[in-house]
Every structure is written in structure tokens, then in C-alpha cells.
């Protein structure tokens, strides 16, 4: 756990509301992104994000510091999403993910390179959106949030080896979707060139 997180947690436990605001601001984008990945609905993701921070506040005294605080709050968010999915008994698939892509596009000097990078990221985001929630969540945690296998295992409640196997399968599914998406574009490109 970072020293800054521990300082904020101690301040919150001492009754400092401003410290909780700082903690929320530090993790709100990450929690919302994970909720949006799993629920695939903006309004649901916003509600679950709020629920996550309410639950975090209420149970902050139970946080022991055995893992990173980010891992702990991801687990709270993950479980809140699972609760919401069970409550709705359906996966909601009607919202595109744009904010996450905007944050991930790197600044480049050449406008053409930026456009190519944006299109590539959008394609990956679109394909991630087509995956089941669990696969999308695992790939997001590992590649975009840079969580370790052990941290992901702690969040989802399975062993690190199982996470590794699930990541492998998720990557294969993503590769298959990408291949299906890219082949028609490549064929169309070469047909236009002739």
C-alpha cells in the first residue's frame, strides 16, 4: 500500500471528510471503468461506483493493509458489480466505452500516427466490449490497469494460476474477434487498391 493511501485512510478513520474526498478522486476513474467494463451500462456503472465508495467508507476500518489499497477497492467494486448483475439477471450491452479510450491514447507528434493509434484503440475497445464481462474485466485489469496475477486473483477470489489460464483463454477469444473484424477490412482495402 502506498504511504499516501495509508495517510488518507488514517485521516478518514479520524473523521476527516476531505481525506475521503481525496481518496474518491484518486480511485473514481478506475472504479468507474471497471464497473462500466462489467456492466456495459453507464448509469449502472455510475450507481455501482457510488455504492463501491459507500461500502469502502463503511468498511474502511476492516482494511488491514495486507494488500495494496487499490487491490482492496477493486475487489469491493468487482463484488458490487457481481451483485448488480445478479440483481438484474442480465448483461447490459448498450453503451460504448469512449472515455477509457480517450485516456489511453498516447500523445504523438504526428497527427496521422495519432489517428492510427486512436483507430487501433477503438477497435480493441469495441472487441473487448463484445467479450463476456469476466473476460473483458480480466484483460482490463491485467493490461490497462497493470494489476499482477496475484492482485487479480485476490480481487476475483481464485488462484493466480487460474487467473493465468483465464487470461490465456480471454486473449484467445479477443484474438478471434479481432481476426474476424480485421479480415473483412483488409480484403476491402486490397479490393479498392486494384
Which ranges hold each PLM region?
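Short, charged helix-capping/linker segments at alpha-helix termini
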Residues: 13-22, 32-51, 155, 160, ...
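Structural recognition of an alpha-helix C-terminal capping motif at a helix-to-coil junction
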Residues: 33, 47-54, 67-79
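Sigma70-family region 2
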Residues: 13-14, 40, 53-68, 87-88
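DNA-recognition helix of helix-turn-helix
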Residues: 82, 124, 135, 144, ...
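C-terminal edge and immediately downstream basic/flexible tail or linker adjoining helix-turn-helix-like DNA-binding
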Residues: 2, 11, 93, 123, ...
Amino acid at each position: 500500500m502506498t504511504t499516501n493511501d495509508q495517510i488518507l485512510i488514517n485521516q478518514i478513520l479520524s473523521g476527516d471528510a476531505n481525506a475521503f474526498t481525496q481518496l474518491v478522486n484518486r480511485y473514481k476513474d478506475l472504479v468507474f471503468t471497471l464497473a462500466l467494463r462489467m456492466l456495459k451500462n453507464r448509469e449502472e456503472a455510475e450507481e455501482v461506483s457510488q455504492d463501491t465508495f459507500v461500502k469502502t467508507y463503511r468498511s474502511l476500518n476492516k482494511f488491514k493493509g495486507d494488500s495494496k489499497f487499490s487491490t482492496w477497492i477493486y475487489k469491493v467494486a468487482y463484488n458490487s458489480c457481481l451483485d448488480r448483475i445478479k440483481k438484474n439477471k442480465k448483461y447490459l450491452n448498450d453503451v460504448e466505452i469512449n472515455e477509457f479510450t480517450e485516456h489511453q491514447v498516447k500523445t504523438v507528434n504526428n497527427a496521422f500516427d495519432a489517428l492510427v493509434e486512436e483507430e487501433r484503440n477503438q477497435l480493441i475497445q469495441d472487441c473487448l466490449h463484445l467479450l463476456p464481462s469476466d473476460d473483458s474485466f480480466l484483460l482490463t485489469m491485467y493490461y490497462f490497469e497493470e494489476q499482477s496475477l496475484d492482485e487479480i486473483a485476490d480481487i476475483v477470489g481464485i488462484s493466480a494460476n487460474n487467473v493465468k489460464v483465464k487470461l490465456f483463454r480471454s486473449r484467445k477469444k479477443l484474438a478471434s474477434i479481432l481476426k474476424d473484424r480485421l479480415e473483412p477490412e483488409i480484403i476491402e482495402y486490397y479490393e479498392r487498391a486494384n
